[in-house]
Amino acid sequence: MEREENIEIKNSFDYILNSVTGLIESRLLYILVKHKVPEVFEDGLPKTYQQVAEKTQTSPIGIYKLLRYFTTSIGLFEEDLNNLGTFKKTPKSSLFTSDKYATFVEWCNNDLAYNMMKSLDLSIETGEPQCHKSLGVNSWWDLIKKPGEEEFFKNAMKVSSSEAIESALKFIDFSPFKKIVDIGGSHGRFVCEILEKYPNSHGINFDLESFFNGAGELIKNPRLEHKSGNFFESVPEGDCYILKRILHDWKDEDCIKILETIGKSILPGGKVIIFDCIINPKNYNKGHLYLDVMMFHFFGSEEKTIKQFSNISDKAGFKIDKVVNEIPNYCLIISKKD
């Protein structure tokens, strides 16, 4: 009986330990991608930790601890048990390379991200977004207007949405649309990929003037225009509007205003395609709830249920036509009510 109790206590402590190590693990992930450790293994050959340290300009003892940790915790590497200190890649490690999700991982775990979380307790206590208070700015939007931050943020979001873009091109038919407007489209990648698949369509990448001024080179296509503006004031005319990870930044009343603005410009028979998480109260998803907390802390907004989307659409003069479940985190297609 005593032995069983000891096992239970040990398992309980392991559970607690696994629950409280997120801080150090996320920071170690930042270090991993900052020094491009996964890239070192992309040739598929085993490496000693000394070789990895030399290539990444880190200390041998430090990189050994890093490799060993991620071999054990999330299976990024494998250590040769017959030649300890020699590691090789796994399929998971490739996800953390620069051409995959490294930029997103870095943005989520860099110094700025850690500072943003210092006031999370205030958001929970007050019920209002307090992220800006730990950063010395008036709002989260002021933060990303700082030199370099908006571009870094947009690049991170671009990487994180790759899977959604691929799925959208697979499961949504854009052929009926002649003019596709991507609201908050950043560099224009999404709408450009749509145009490549649908040669009879034209596109408009619509974003803030402040972003275009600091965005560097935008994606070019003879059938693509880049236009600046404010979606609370007006948007270009089109028969298809894309809202990818836009509405979750805003409270319901602001979402209604955005859709009302689109409603003034949308052509007859047009559609609005919304890419956002859909919270299912009967089957919660940890990733959705993580984003829900972040949106609350940053903006006072949230990830929404299908009921909320229905109410928002209805009040803005739209109706839900379809939920596309095949797309990661889901997608809604809405149109103007008759």
Curated annotation (Swiss-Prot):
It is an enzyme of class 2 (transferase). The active site is at 248 (proton acceptor). InterPro entries: COMT-like, O_MeTrfase_dom, Plant_O-MeTrfase_dimerisation, SAM-dependent_MTases_sf, WH-like_DNA-bd_sf, WH_DNA-bd_sf. It comes from the Eukaryota. GO terms for biological process: biosynthetic process; methylation. It catalyses: (3,5-dichloro-2,4,6-trihydroxyphenyl)hexan-1-one + S-adenosyl-L-methionine = 1-(3,5-dichloro-2,6-dihydroxy-4-methoxyphenyl)hexan-1-one + S-adenosyl-L-homocysteine + H(+). Belongs to the class I-like SAM-binding methyltransferase superfamily. Cation-independent O-methyltransferase family. COMT subfamily. This is O-methyltransferase 4. It comes from Dictyostelium discoideum (Social amoeba). The gene is omt4.
